[in-house]
């Protein structure tokens, strides 16, 4: 009986080690495919690119703030046990003019909770329109850089780099990227995400190769 139990535990551990990594995306409308079909969003395109080599869970909600994300994250971590957490929040904080210190506190909670759950964190930064004033804008964008430095995180400085100022890639509201922009968003994320995947992928799936 002891031998059988030990064998079962060994097999369970081996299966877990071979399981593909699990990615949890916690974001707002930029990651929730707002205004387009879900299958067109960059998170869905990420799942397609990974092609079963990782499980992608999209817990993004349009309109979400960093405070809402921080409140939801503990349950998400417990439910999904992710290996990598992609944090894409702050845009709605900025558009509402919320204090950058509040954004930093909320993202800090999320980073620390993710790391306590042994997940790697990828921080996806965002910018806000210049009409909010340069001082506020600098303080806002600086939050992402400081947190990346403080917690030694990989950072995508601006998720919509090369997209936000191109009207052909934005919806009519000028805030949300359209379907044509989604592959470009994924291309902005991929260089920072790939090193984390390389660390968590089982040997049999590294470099895109299957046994």
Where are these regions (language model features)?
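Bacterial N-terminal signal peptides
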Residues: 2-12
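Intrinsic disorder/low-complexity signature
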Residues: 3, 15, 55, 204-207
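A general structural-boundary detector
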Residues: 4, 33, 56, 60, ...
